[in-house]
Every structure is written in C-alpha cells, then in structure tokens.
Amino acid sequence: MTNADPHELQKFSDLAHRWWDPNAEFKPLHDLNPVRLGWIDAHAHLAGKRALDIGCGGGILSESMAGLGAQVKGIDLSTEALGVADLHSLESGISVDYEAIAAEAIAAREPGTYDVVTCMEMLEHVPSPGDVVAACATLVKPGGWVFFSTLNRNLKSYLFAVIGAEYIAQMLPKGTHDYARFIRPSELAGFVRATDLHIVEIKGITYHPIGKRFALSNDTDINYLVACRRGA
C-alpha cells in the first residue's frame, strides 16, 4: 500500500500548472528555496554529488541542486507535477531525471545509492512519515547526507502557518496544511533514531514580513530544517 493520501496528492496535482509562477500559490516555496538550498549546499557540497529529491513536485529544489552541479533525480507521486517539472527542465536546460515512484519503492530498488537525499515540506503530507524517514536512511550512502524540512506542531505554528499564512495573509491556498499532521522536532528525532542516521543540525526558518523574506534562525517553533548523516 502506497504511503500517500489521495486528497493531498489531488490538492497539489490541481495546482501543478502553477508551480513555476513565482507570484502564485507556490510563491512561498520560491522565496524559501534560496535559503534551504544554501543550507543544504553548506553541509553536503552538492557539486558532483548524486542527489535524490523526494516529493519534488514541480522541481524547484531539484533544478536548483542540479544548477549547483549535482546529478539529481526527483520523485513524486503526482504525475501532473512531474509533467510540469519535465517541461521546465527542458525550457531551462537544466537536466533532472524525474520519476513517479514512492520513497519506499525506490528505497527497495536503489539502497545506498545517493550522496544526498532531500525530503522538504513533504513529511507533513503523508500518513506515515516515519516510513519515509526510514526510506531516506536506506537510500543514502554511508557517510551521506539526508535533509528534512517540516512544520512544528504547537499553537504558534497553527496560528502562523495555518490561520496567518492561509487565511489572513493568503500566502498559501486554504487547506494546504492539516495541522494534525505537523511534526514536532522530538517526533522527527524519534523517527531518525530508529534508523542509522544521526542528527547533525536543526535550524528554524523565520519569515520577515517587512522584507518579505525567509532566513535561517534558532527558532524552530514553526518551520524547521533537520540535517542528518548516515554513519560511514
């Protein structure tokens, strides 16, 4: 059984044609991308590395990593989003290999294959996030890096990420997030501890409304990033 929620898949498939419009529904991802890309590259030094982007959607992060010299494969279960990703790759001239396959399925097929595995803004959209974390641990080479980003579960994150971002500021479409699926850092750390990954760094992401920009911070109350490494 695929670890996916049909409602979540349909939600993002319906918006697939908007992935690369920097002023549409995925504007927050476009604004966030330079921050997360720089953080990933600072740890993993992407040039020349083989990278897998799980839950790649329309390919915003996948293309960015390829642009830094990584050999990138992007996977997603939304064929509509992957169609947009393929088309944009042709238009940009940045080569990325896209495939419609679940993380668990590719982990069974390609264990220990990738230097870098990214799973960004995806765990909070699947029924069993721990299974995805385990798949990431299987996919990465010994000594390789795995990166996660997700949303903390607390009153502050509900007020800012759901009420504020979706209903007041309308930065995201209503219904983008299901608060019950937000993941506390301690819960994600538990998933990681069940694998042979170890956590290297946890960073928060803060949004500055005046400058309309995201920045790394030590505040993990809302959005946060986790860098993990597999034992050599």
Swiss-Prot record:
The record's listing under InterPro entries reads:
SAM-dependent_MTases_sf (IPR029063), UbiG_MeTrfase (IPR010233)
Q: Does the keyword Cell wall biogenesis/degradation apply?
A: no
Q: Which reaction does it catalyse?
A: a 3-demethylubiquinol + S-adenosyl-L-methionine = a ubiquinol + S-adenosyl-L-homocysteine + H(+); a 3-(all-trans-polyprenyl)benzene-1,2-diol + S-adenosyl-L-methionine = a 2-methoxy-6-(all-trans-polyprenyl)phenol + S-adenosyl-L-homocysteine + H(+)
EC no. given is 2.1.1.222, 2.1.1.64
The pathway this protein participates in, as annotated, is:
Cofactor biosynthesis; ubiquinone biosynthesis
UniProt-listed CDD domains: AdoMet_MTases (cd02440)
- The source's superkingdom equals Bacteria
Q: Which GO terms describe its biological process?
A: methylation
Enzyme category, top tier: transferase
Pfam family for this entry, one: Methyltransf_23
Sorted UniProt keywords: Methyltransferase, S-adenosyl-L-methionine, Transferase, Ubiquinone biosynthesis
This entry's Gene Ontology molecular function terms read: 2-polyprenyl-6-hydroxyphenol methylase activity; 3-demethylubiquinol 3-O-methyltransferase activity; polyprenyldihydroxybenzoate methyltransferase activity
Binding-site residues for S-adenosyl-L-methionine, renumbered to this chain: R36, G55, D76, M120
Q: Does the keyword Mitochondrion apply?
A: no
Q: Which family does it belong to?
A: Belongs to the methyltransferase superfamily. UbiG/COQ3 family.
NCBIfam families documented for this protein: UbiG
Q: Quote the function comment for this protein.
A: O-methyltransferase that catalyzes the 2 O-methylation steps in the ubiquinone biosynthetic pathway.
What protein is this chain from?
Answer: Ubiquinone biosynthesis O-methyltransferase
Q: Which organism is it from?
A: Burkholderia cenocepacia (strain ATCC BAA-245 / DSM 16553 / LMG 16656 / NCTC 13227 / J2315 / CF5610) (Burkholderia cepacia (strain J2315))
Task: Name the gene behind this protein.
Answer: ubiG
